[in-house]
Every structure is written in structure tokens, then in C-alpha cells.
């Protein structure tokens, strides 16, 4: 398969690009230049790997979920344990890389957006480590849902700005973070949390997250002597999925499955299934599939999981859908909750609600596969942050 994206203008087919105001263009170009240089610099790579190994705790285990496998019948189920990273999710793979890049560029301050709070915590964490000032924008609704993560960020020295505009969720937090970046661009780096935004952000985030798929490939071959037949990951903006999928894109014998949030059902207005129900548009500096109405107004995305309710999806996922290399599906709130409880009871692992969407789809997929086949789930994060809201949800039901 001939796959080499993005092109030199930052496009993935028709998607991606740089739809930014003139005031930001210079910074985006400067970032691209700095990033290219850093990736070719052995000292930078060495420093990054040092922190990934000794601070983040990589490599993360590839765990054979024997009880889940027995329960499902069919394929052997493996879990890539990104929940065991420092701060409890895949987010830190990207924040540590971008923070080192910020230091390299001479920036003193970092701004970021966060939905579930995981990216905010991971950003505040690396800023504490590297002595950078940190400002985090978070939607009002998410601040309510994720009180503990807000407190964590503040403990780590970050300033958390609550965003009341719009729906008070991730999309609005990104708007404010971009606005802040425009006016503080001389001394501030924006750490985008997913494979979104203007080029080079989708590429930078993908490359820093690719450690997930690269490790998985190596570990699976050591365990089974071949590549897995299927790989499953959840998708909000799509960074854990892109990090898992990208190293497998050329291995066409490996089926790739991305799982979005169907919320209350894709037949309702309350979902975040952008690739299933969306259409092409521009948001936050990039062309991608979006949830929008006929007038092109962005629609509210809904998911029980704060990390999946973004109304867009990364440009590279948009392309991978169009060319058919990745198969995209959606899972409802209820199905995700069921999978959350099942994995907890069967394996003693409490997954994040985001990751539970991937687990739920894998539960449908595994029984359709043969016993000598393997299925890897990217367990993108741990569920400590969700226990309170799940308790509330179950009491209401």
C-alpha cells in the first residue's frame, strides 16, 4: 500500500491543511521547522526516550486477557496497557515530546485544552517537570464532570481557566486555547492534545503517539511470532488510535477498527459519531469530518465519556475512512458501561470510559474470529477519573 501522508502542505488527501489566521501562520511554520530539526537530532531523540522510559514508564505491557478471551470465545484478546503510563493514560506520550520541543524553541509558557482532564493533567505534569508555566482551558461542563482532575492540575501548578462559551466542552476549550495562543505566541507553545488542529499538529501528535503501535508490533511478534489479525482503539479526536494504527497502516493483513461514541444512539442527536454521521468541514484550523447542520454550524457532540465528545475527528482518520484502510464503528453509552463493568470484573482492570468503547466493540468482534487469531485493544487510559460519574449514572438508571 502506497501511503505517505501528510504531503508537504500538511494535507491527508483533501483533509488537514492550515486554516489559520495570518497572526498564527508564522508560528505554525516555525513549529514545523523546529519539529523537523528535532526529529533528525539524535540528542533530542535520546532525551525523549530517556523520559519515556524513566519518567513515563515505557514500554507498557501487552497483556493477554485470558478471562476475557474465555468469556468471549474466538480470538485471543490482548490489552495494550496505556493505562499504566504515569498520569494514567496515553496522553503523556505526546505532552512530554511537545514540552521538550517547547523548551528547545525557547518558549517559557505552555497553553493546552482538555476535555476529560487527562491531557490537562499530562500537560501540567510535564510543565512541572521541565519548569514551564502552564495554562489549561477546560469547558465549564467538563470542569463539573472532572473535579478531581481540575484539582490535580492546580496541585501541579497549572492555572485552569473554565470556559462557559458554547456548550462548555472540549470544542469551546480549544477555541479559547487557540485565542490565547494567538495573543501570547512570542513566549508560548500550544500543546494540542489530539491529532487535530492546523499542520503540523496532527503529524506531531501522531508521531509522538506512534510509540504505542511500534511497541505493540514488537511485543506481539515476540509473543505470537506474527502480527495480530485485528487492532481496536477508541476515537474522540483520535490520538491513541492514530498512535496505535499508524505503525500498522502498511501491514494490510492487520484489520484496524476505530470506535467512536454513539452516545444515546446514532439515530438521536446525542452522539459523537463523527465518521459515521458527519460531513466534511473546517474546524480549529483543519479540514476533517465534522458533526454540523445544513448551515455548517457545529453540532453538540454527546458521550458519557468526556474525552470522546469532540464534534470533529483528526484529518488522517478522515482519510483512512475514505480509503477504507480503517473500519470505523460506534458504541453507545450503555454498551461502553457494560464493557467497563465486564473488564473490571473479569480482569481486575478498571478502564477509562473512553477505552471502554474499544473494549465493547472488541467483545462483538472477538467471537467472530478464530481461536488462533489475535485481537489487540488499545487500553488508552485507566478509569479512576470516571468512577464517580459512573456511580452517579448507575444510581440514576
UniProtKB/Swiss-Prot annotation:
**UniProt cross-references to PROSITE patterns, sorted A to Z:** TRP_SYNTHASE_BETA (PS00168)
Q: Which residues carry this modification: N6-(pyridoxal phosphate)lysine?
A: 91
Which pathway is this protein engaged in? Amino-acid biosynthesis; L-tryptophan biosynthesis; L-tryptophan from chorismate: step 5/5
* InterPro entries referenced in this protein's UniProt entry, alphabetically: Trp_synth_b_CS, Trp_synth_beta, Trp_synth_beta/beta-like, TrpB-like_PALP, TrpB-like_PALP_sf
- Any keyword Hydrolase? no
Q: Which SUPFAM superfamilies match?
A: Tryptophan synthase beta subunit-like PLP-dependent enzymes (SSF53686)
Q: Which cofactor does it need?
A: pyridoxal 5'-phosphate
Give the EC number: 4.2.1.20
- What start-end ranges are recorded for coiled-coil regions in this protein? none
Catalysed reactions listed for this entry: (1S,2R)-1-C-(indol-3-yl)glycerol 3-phosphate + L-serine = D-glyceraldehyde 3-phosphate + L-tryptophan + H2O
Any one GO CC term of the record = cytoplasm
One Pfam annotation reads PALP
Which top-level group of life is the source organism from? Bacteria
Which HAMAP family does this chain map to? Trp_synth_beta
Q: Which family does it belong to?
A: Belongs to the TrpB family.
Quaternary structure (record) = Tetramer of two alpha and two beta chains.
Q: What is this protein called?
A: Tryptophan synthase beta chain
The organism is Bacillus thuringiensis (strain Al Hakam)
In the record, what lineage is assigned to the organism producing the protein? Bacteria, Bacillati, Bacillota, Bacilli, Bacillales
